[in-house]
Amino acid sequence: MAPAPTPAAAAGRRVAVLAAALVAASLAASVGVANAAVSYDRRSLVINGRRRILLSGSIHYPRSTPEMWPGLIQKAKDGGLDVIQTYVFWNGHEPVQGQYYFSDRYDLVRFVKLVKQAGLYVHLRIGPYVCAEWNFGGFPVWLKYVPGVSFRTDNGPFKAEMQKFVEKIVSMMKSEGLFEWQGGPIIMSQVENEFGPMESVGGSGAKPYANWAAKMAVRTNTGVPWVMCKQDDAPDPVINTCNGFYCDYFSPNKNYKPSMWTEAWTGWFTSFGGGVPHRPVEDLAFAVARFIQKGGSFVNYYMYHGGTNFGRTAGGPFIATSYDYDAPIDEFGLLRQPKWGHLRDLHRAIKQAEPVLVSADPTIESIGSYEKAYVFKAKNGACAAFLSNYHMNTAVKVRFNGQQYNLPAWSISILPDCKTAVFNTATVKEPTLMPKMNPVVRFAWQSYSEDTNSLSDSAFTKDGLVEQLSMTWDKSDYLWYTTYVNIGTNDLRSGQSPQLTVYSAGHSMQVFVNGKSYGSVYGGYDNPKLTYNGRVKMWQGSNKISILSSAVGLPNVGNHFENWNVGVLGPVTLSSLNGGTKDLSHQKWTYQVGLKGETLGLHTVTGSSAVEWGGPGGYQPLTWHKAFFNAPAGNDPVALDMGSMGKGQLWVNGHHVGRYWSYKASGGCGGCSYAGTYHEDKCRSNCGDLSQRWYHVPRSWLKPGGNLLVVLEEYGGDLAGVSLATRTT
């Protein structure tokens, strides 16, 4: 039983109640309706007058196809979720300044309406910064070149563009009647994203920017609460929320705000060159139960379905095309068991206790050295309890309310009536299902080689080296750097080939001299910068040096995005010459954005028919390959096995599957116990093997016959090893 409150504590509670009332009034005013359909108090969100424990899952609409959305949403509902959470992806919706796109995978309105049809709510994270391992953190690249712009700080040009986009999204949602008070599913919005950690390094403009963002958002009058995640100083009425593997330590910045977990990480992302992360469901369920037993009322699984970084949407750099995230619904839309089923059972147990959980604060009883009981008691006599064992190795028997209960190590049992343990986080009853890839199609190939020794009419010349993104504006991963060097009679007298050294900000680079390939180098997720050092054969007279710089996704984390660079920044030197070392950095360079095949549209049916294709190109670098195939029978998800190839990009019927790369994972993959604190380097697989081998091709992109597969291979690979497979469990 809780002790009687002291007079000081009672006074403090009266102050808290008064403050909560003032915030509720402020919230009602800010949402622009007389009686807000969605509000909050210290225990939870309040929807139409009812406190709710809400279980949510992230499904990002551009990471799957519209044809997949209904099935994914239904599986989320069947798994016991109340809410679907998604970011809004600015660079997908405004790829060119002032030109908007809301079709196909970016049909946000259609996605939100499908959630409504399924009877679920929506948490709309407008941002518009998203991070999300998404290219440039969701910012459109054109924003980098707005005069005077400085990202995520108290900067006029940046704030003007950000406000314009936020207001556009809010206006669109209102016009479609999609906020809850309009009869729609949106119960909550988010502005900015994980900015709190940036404030300490963001300078004097950081805190004013965060306050401006909150006030700007509230002024849009969405009619629902706004949140800011990882923002401890979020001003009223905005709710600050938690992201992480665990959030039971978290408390909101005011005692009249609810405790909300906007990102409960179900796993982690995969990077090219990194192992594949897995999070045991026993630990994930333990983390969620810990949060709920401490008084948490909103949990969102990030991700519930991760999906695919189609096209060039992956960020990082070096984020893989798969965004599976070890989520309860896998990249292909299939249930990951036992994770999905075990969490479903957890949700059922929590929902049984919901009326008590939202009506009382827990009291804590010690029932052992590492064991505690969190007990919720309602005024009507209802009772719910969470029995916790924090020991990582030892199962125990505990007594509670006169009964004995078995608690496995690192686990929590839920008793919705304070008597019957209906669920234990470490007791998994759902069988494990192992997915299988079933090869069904091999290909007959034709090839077309890029001309590495010619320049198009679009090429242009500048003095010195130029940063890549300022030239490409991310319209292509590729930028050619070409220069000429004159070798005199005496330069080669030693008989030794000159040594070319090229320093680059990243991310991958190939070197050609007089049309001949001299290899490639690349960085990695932890350090994208790279240096090429190689002997190159040259002759007396003029020699052509061509460097193909390739981006592998733009960074997605940080604040001053305007300062980030890609490409060859130099110096570029030629040494081992009798005349000494030549610094080529400041001479004239000719630049060409993209590859010839991109300009010709070789990835499309029309473009691929406009050139003469030859026989299979084998291990030749910078070669396009195409093949036609029939769709596999049935409805099982489909994937391409690219493990025999090098690095490049894929298209099917003109749809951009994404980047592929047979980059082997470094590091160690040790044992994996569910017990003990989880982190992203724990429980990894594929060390010493490919980070990603299989690439998802959505069924809706296929027709029964005559499907066109186009592969752009940068390094060279074995075409005979490429196959199409179906995925089953």
From Swiss-Prot:
Q: GO cellular component terms?
A: apoplast
According to UniProt, the reaction catalysed is: Hydrolysis of terminal non-reducing beta-D-galactose residues in beta-D-galactosides
Gene3D superfamilies referenced in this protein's UniProt entry, alphabetically: Galactose-binding domain-like, Glycosidases
**Enzyme Commission number(s) from the entry:** 3.2.1.23
* Location within or outside the cell: Secreted, Extracellular space, Apoplast
Superkingdom, taxonomy of origin: Eukaryota
PROSITE patterns noted in UniProt: GLYCOSYL_HYDROL_F35
Q: Which keywords, in A-to-Z order, does the entry hold?
A: Apoplast, Glycosidase, Hydrolase, Secreted, Signal
Active site residues per record: E194, E263
Q: Which GO terms describe its biological process?
A: carbohydrate metabolic process
- The enzyme's first-digit EC class, named in words, is hydrolase
* GO molecular function terms noted in the UniProt entry: beta-galactosidase activity
Instruction: Give the signal peptide range.
Output: 1-35
SUPFAM superfamilies annotated for this entry? (Trans)glycosidases (SSF51445), Galactose-binding domain-like (SSF49785)
Stored Pfam families:
BetaGal_gal-bd, GHD, Glyco_hydro_35
- PANTHER family of this UniProt entry? BETA-GALACTOSIDASE RELATED
Membership in a protein family: Belongs to the glycosyl hydrolase 35 family.
What is this protein called in UniProt? Beta-galactosidase 4
Write down the species: Oryza sativa subsp. indica (Rice)
Q: What is the lineage of its organism?
A: Eukaryota, Viridiplantae, Streptophyta, Embryophyta, Tracheophyta
